[in-house]
Amino acid sequence: MTELEHLAERVRDAIPLTRHLAFRFAGFDGATLTLTAPLAPNHNDKGTFFAGSQAALLTLAGWACTTLLAEALVKETADIEGPVDVVAVEGNQNYRLPLNDDLTVLAIVTDDDRRRFRERLARRGKATLTVRARALNPAGDTVCEFEGLYLARLGG
């Protein structure tokens, strides 16, 4: 099982709502997390992707990105111990277009934000991270924009 598959399993076990979203963590390169989800379990009465599902998936992508970055710091640094606890502090989304198809989310952390986050988490045992995300349709058009603030704490 890959690290992303293990994280998805942890999420589904801990947050029952996520089982219904049928999401998949499709990739993480240390700066961008990719999440995908099908329309079928997430549609609304108009047959488009439900805004509530989009909000949940965007929030989840930001949480997962923060969690992966914090857990990587723990693995890389001998004198830092886990577990890591991450919570969403703030989140705002702006819906741009209706979505009649499957969804791809790109959750992105800038190099400067990632560096500051790692430094503060290592020094203080807690740190906030801003994650920006875009929900895309299959053509690559942005259907929703999101910005979230997450707090990570070491020691759970």
Please place each PLM-identified region on the residue numbering:
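Extreme N-terminal tail/first-helix region
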Residues: 1-16
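Hot-dog-fold acyl-thioester-processing enzymes
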Residues: 38-78, 82-85
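Residue-level preference for beta-strand/loop junctions
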Residues: 17, 31, 85-87, 101, ...
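Hydrophobic beta-strand-centered segment that forms part of the acyl-chain substrate-binding groove
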Residues: 65-112
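Catalytic strand-loop segment that frames the active site of acyl-thioester-processing enzymes
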Residues: 17-49
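Hydrophobic residues positioned within well-ordered beta-strands of beta-sheet architectures
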Residues: 33-35, 89-91, 105, 129-131, ...
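Short structured motifs
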Residues: 19-23, 89-95, 116-118
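HotDog/MaoC-like acyl-thioester-processing domains
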Residues: 98-100, 110-156
